């Protein structure tokens, strides 16, 4: 796409009177700052009349089913709401135009009005909690929505057909500098044994990309008279839900149970490999996933990188991962095969996407090379090299689009059902 022009996403209101243009759908959180949300809204002047053009950005945490939103009680908490009066521009909302806004206004004309939002760095990233097989409607989790509409004031009731709603994502990418190599060790002294059992485990690195195998090096020194009967390795996802109070949910996303034994007065060393995949965890209701924009496949939620001193109460969902290594040790004696004792260590690590490579500068498109793509709408190819793509979700078989979801948002899971 980089050699065809600057891609701009657009979405129109159902009545066709407003259209919002954004340069991207993913906005990167760099820990100390977040990329601004900048775009323009194109309004039919005959429809606008004497009203004003407003754009809002909302970060919300939905934690229950929409069909239970009755009597003014909703299972949704707005973590952040910002409003901009795009036209006529309010003095406090007027900001210098970005390069994208300048180009869009030049192309779209005088009825295109700019808007810019600054996202606070301590807000959560977009996370979806995996629904169960029978769940329908909007999934629980944290999402960001841009909404544009015309009204006399912000309190006026806005109908869906007269407004534009776009779901965007706040994302983080793996840091360029990894942390120290995760290692952990423990020593256990047993009754009736003069010497201890020592377990040491390590990972080959601290940062893993989604889909990358995790190598776990396990070293056991068994100086006891006990036998290690089994070694269990698991990758666990931890999701801290910070809402009215803080609760932690853990879920194994990859496991291996090896029948490797370690006899008394012996040592053992082996490298185990596990790869956490969402495909192997489809049935796990409430598993944290990266936020979705379309009905396309996603992945396990990325680890959350926190800024020092961040207010954890405002962070909706904090995701982390650990590898757990557990030795199942026979106690010996008459109950040796029936009773056992566990020795375990945990290794925290980071699971994320790598930072995308910077796109090369866009080249001008010669007239004879005008690209043809039925999925894109391109205007004035030779003028300013901008390509417009519909923002709406792709409709797949058995899936609902945005409008259907909003009108039939039932059956999504509640946190208490996890």
Swiss-Prot record:
Modified residues (Phosphoserine): 412
Chief localization: cytoplasm
Recorded consequence of changing residue 160 to Q: Impairs InsP6-binding and oligomerization
Tissue distribution: Beta-arrestin 1A is found in cortex, cerebellum, striatum, pineal gland, retina and heart. Beta-arrestin 1B is found in spleen, lung, pituitary and kidney.
Residues binding 1D-myo-inositol hexakisphosphate, per UniProt: 250, 255, 324, 326
Keyword Cytoplasm: yes
Gene Ontology cellular component annotations, sorted alphabetically: clathrin coat of coated pit; cytoplasm; cytoplasmic vesicle; cytosol; nucleus; plasma membrane; pseudopodium
Residue segments, region Interaction with SRC: 1-163
SUPFAM superfamilies reported for this sequence: E set domains
Chain residue ranges for the region called Interaction with CHRM2: 45-86
Post-translational modification: Constitutively phosphorylated at Ser-412 in the cytoplasm. At the plasma membrane, is rapidly dephosphorylated, a process that is required for clathrin binding and ADRB2 endocytosis but not for ADRB2 binding and desensitization. Once internalized, is rephosphorylated. The ubiquitination status appears to regulate the formation and trafficking of beta-arrestin-GPCR complexes and signaling. Ubiquitination appears to occur GPCR-specific. Ubiquitinated by MDM2; the ubiquitination is required for rapid internalization of ADRB2. Deubiquitinated by USP33; the deubiquitination leads to a dissociation of the beta-arrestin-GPCR complex. Stimulation of a class A GPCR, such as ADRB2, induces transient ubiquitination and subsequently promotes association with USP33.
Gene Ontology terms, MF aspect: acetylcholine receptor binding; AP-2 adaptor complex binding; clathrin binding; clathrin heavy chain binding; G protein-coupled receptor binding; inositol hexakisphosphate binding; molecular adaptor activity; phosphatidylinositol-3,4,5-trisphosphate binding
Entry-annotated residues carrying Phosphotyrosine: 47
Subcellular location: Cytoplasm; Nucleus; Cell membrane; Membrane, Clathrin-coated pit
Biased amino acid composition, Basic and acidic residues: 355-371
UniProtKB keywords: Cell membrane, Cell projection, Coated pit, Cytoplasm, Cytoplasmic vesicle, Membrane, Nucleus, Phosphoprotein, Protein transport, Signal transduction inhibitor, Transcription, Transcription regulation, Transport, Ubl conjugation
Consequence of substituting residue 161 to Q: Impairs InsP6-binding and oligomerization
One Gene Ontology biological process: signal transduction
Motif placement: [DE]-X(1,2)-F-X-X-[FL]-X-X-X-R motif: 385-395
Segments for region (Disordered): 353-375, 397-418
Annotated stretches, region: Interaction with TRAF6: 318-418
Record function comment: Functions in regulating agonist-mediated G-protein coupled receptor (GPCR) signaling by mediating both receptor desensitization and resensitization processes. During homologous desensitization, beta-arrestins bind to the GPRK-phosphorylated receptor and sterically preclude its coupling to the cognate G-protein; the binding appears to require additional receptor determinants exposed only in the active receptor conformation.
PANTHER family noted in UniProt: ARRESTIN, BETA-ARRESTIN-1
Subunit relationships: Monomer. Homodimer. Homooligomer; the self-association is mediated by InsP6-binding. Heterooligomer with ARRB2; the association is mediated by InsP6-binding. Interacts with ADRB2 (phosphorylated). Interacts with CHRM2 (phosphorylated). Interacts with LHCGR. Interacts with CYTH2 and CASR. Interacts with AP2B1 (dephosphorylated at 'Tyr-737'); phosphorylation of AP2B1 at 'Tyr-737' disrupts the interaction. Interacts (dephosphorylated at Ser-412) with CLTC. Interacts with CCR2 and GRK2. Interacts with CRR5. Interacts with PTAFR (phosphorylated on serine residues). Interacts with CLTC and MAP2K3.
Domain-level remarks: The [DE]-X(1,2)-F-X-X-[FL]-X-X-X-R motif mediates interaction the AP-2 complex subunit AP2B1. Binding to phosphorylated GPCRs induces a conformationanl change that exposes the motif to the surface. The N-terminus binds InsP6 with low affinity.
Protein name in the entry: Beta-arrestin-1
Species in which this protein is naturally found: Bos taurus
Primary gene name: ARRB1
């Amino acid at each position: 796409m980089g050699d065809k022009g600057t891609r701009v996403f657009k979405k129109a209101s159902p009545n066709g009177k407003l259209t919002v243009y954004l340069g991207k759908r993913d906005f990167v959180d760099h820990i100390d700052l977040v990329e601004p949300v900048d775009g323009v809204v194109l309004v039919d002047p005959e429809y606008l009349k004497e009203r004003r053009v407003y754009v809002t950005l909302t970060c919300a945490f939905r934690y229950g089913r929409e069909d239970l939103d009755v009597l003014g009680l909703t299972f949704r908490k707005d973590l952040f709401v910002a409003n901009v009066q795009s036209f006529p521009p309010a003095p406090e909302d007027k900001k210098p135009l970005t390069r994208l806004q300048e180009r869009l206004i030049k192309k779209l004309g005088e009825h295109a009005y700019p808007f810019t939002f600054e996202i606070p760095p301590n807000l959560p990233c977009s996370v979806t909690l995996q629904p169960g097989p029978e769940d329908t409607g909007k999934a629980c989790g944290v999402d960001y929505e841009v909404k544009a509409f015309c009204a006399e004031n912000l309190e006026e009731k806005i109908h869906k057909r007269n407004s534009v709603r776009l779901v965007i994502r706040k994302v983080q990418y793996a840091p360029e500098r990894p942390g120290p190599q995760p290692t952990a060790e423990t020593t256990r002294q047993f009754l009736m044994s003069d010497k201890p059992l020592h377990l040491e485990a390590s990972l080959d690195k601290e940062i893993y990309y989604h889909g990358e195998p995790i190598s776990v090096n396990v070293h056991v020194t068994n100086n006891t008279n006990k036998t290690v009967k089994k070694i269990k390795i698991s990758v666990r996802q931890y999701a801290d839900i910070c809402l009215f109070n803080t609760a932690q949910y853990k879920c194994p996303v990859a496991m291996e149970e090896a029948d490797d034994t370690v006899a008394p007065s012996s040592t053992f060393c082996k490298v185990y490999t596990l790869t956490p995949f969402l495909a192997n965890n489809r049935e796990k209701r409430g598993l944290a996933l990266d936020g979705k924009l379309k009905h396309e496949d996603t992945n396990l939620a990325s680890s959350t990188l926190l800024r020092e001193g961040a207010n954890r109460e405002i962070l909706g969902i904090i995701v982390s991962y650990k590898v757990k290594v557990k030795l199942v040790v026979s106690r010996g004696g008459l109950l040796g095969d029936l009773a056992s004792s566990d020795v375990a260590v945990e290794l925290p690590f980071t699971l994320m996407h790598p930072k995308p490579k910077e796109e090369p500068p866009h080249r001008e498109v010669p007239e004879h090379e005008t690209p043809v793509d039925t999925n894109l709408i391109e205007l004035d190819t030779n003028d300013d090299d901008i390509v417009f793509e519909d923002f709406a979700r792709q409709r797949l078989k058995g899936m609902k689009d945005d409008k259907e979801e909003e009108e039939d948002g039932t059956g999504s899971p509640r946190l208490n059902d996890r």
